[in-house]
């Protein structure tokens, strides 16, 4: 059993180790938020199971995914669980390895390039900057209840870079809460859609303008929201 991060965006951002495991798998259990070219790495005889995991589209419940992993592993097959980005950055990889541990199924983990760092970077936005931003905070843009995280006030108080994942739909609420809790309306913000892909789009503004800018540009998910403490 291999828990593999596919990286963010184009297929060639996967690690060499991750690609090699896919080439030798019997079963490939994959998220929809990956480059479909990666499916071609698997043997023709491999069973390929899509479990979704994309906002606004049908996805298997996490419990069902866990059951699939255990079932296929107990059949004696080499299983690759291919997850978008990095398995442990809002990827629920921790829940999956807990299930595997409980079932006494050995596993290996292959990290992936996370969109939280790579997408801003590819847009020319460093998440840390000497003497200007000494920390970076990676925050979910929505919870299971489709609400903002409870620590949004602390996010507003930090001088570090804020990176929100899966938060495009909640952008107005994120902006409102940051301003209400003390973040300057002039704080630079960027929203990067489909980062690390050929069709990527970057929209820039400030907390006071970004919502209107994003609406005018018709930005679509997946998107990463970055608020920086420098210009």
Question: Where on the chain are the PLM-derived regions?
Answer:
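Class I S-adenosyl-L-methionine
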Residues: 1-11, 16-110, 118, 211
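A contiguous loop/helix-start segment that scaffolds small-molecule binding in enzyme catalytic cores
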Residues: 1-3, 75-79, 135, 144-229
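Class I SAM-dependent methyltransferase SAM-binding "motif I" and its flanking Rossmann-like core
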Residues: 10, 86-158, 201-204
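Short, solvent-exposed amphipathic alpha-helical segments in soluble enzyme
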Residues: 17-21, 43-46, 96-99, 124-125, ...
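Cofactor-binding loop segments of dinucleotide-utilizing enzymes, especially the Rossmann-like FAD-
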Residues: 33, 141, 194
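Short gly/pro/ser/thr-enriched loop/turn and capping motifs at secondary-structure boundaries
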Residues: 36-37, 55-57, 114-118, 136-137, ...
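Short hydrophobic/aromatic-enriched beta-strand-loop microsegments
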Residues: 46-53, 106-108, 127-134, 182-191
């Amino acid at each position: 059993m291999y828990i593999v991060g596919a990286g963010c965006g184009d297929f060639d951002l996967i690690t060499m180790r991750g690609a090699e495991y896919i080439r030798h798998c019997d079963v490939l259990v994959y998220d929809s938020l990956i480059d479909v070219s990666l499916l071609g790495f698997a043997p023709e005889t491999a069973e390929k199971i899509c479990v979704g995991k994309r906002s606004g589209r049908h996805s298997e419940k996490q419990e069902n995914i866990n059951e699939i992993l255990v079932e296929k592993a107990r059949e004696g097959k080499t299983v690759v669980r291919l997850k978008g980005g990095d398995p442990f950055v809002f990827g629920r990889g921790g829940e999956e390895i807990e299930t595997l541990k409980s079932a006494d199924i050995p596993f290996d983990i292959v990290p992936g390039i996370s969109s939280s760092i790579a997408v801003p970077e590819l847009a020319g936005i460093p998440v840390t900057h000497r003497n200007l931003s000494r920390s970076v905070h990676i925050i979910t843009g929505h919870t299971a209840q489709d609400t903002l995280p409870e620590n949004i006030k602390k996010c507003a108080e930090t001088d570090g870079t804020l990176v929100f994942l899966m938060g495009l739909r909640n952008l107005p609420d994120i902006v409102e809460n940051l301003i209400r809790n003390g973040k300057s309306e002039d704080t630079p913000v960027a929203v990067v859609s489909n980062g690390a892909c050929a069709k990527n789009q970057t929209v820039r503004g400030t907390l006071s303008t970004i919502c209107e800018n994003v609406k005018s540009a018709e930005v679509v998910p997946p998107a990463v929201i970055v608020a920086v403490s420098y210009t």
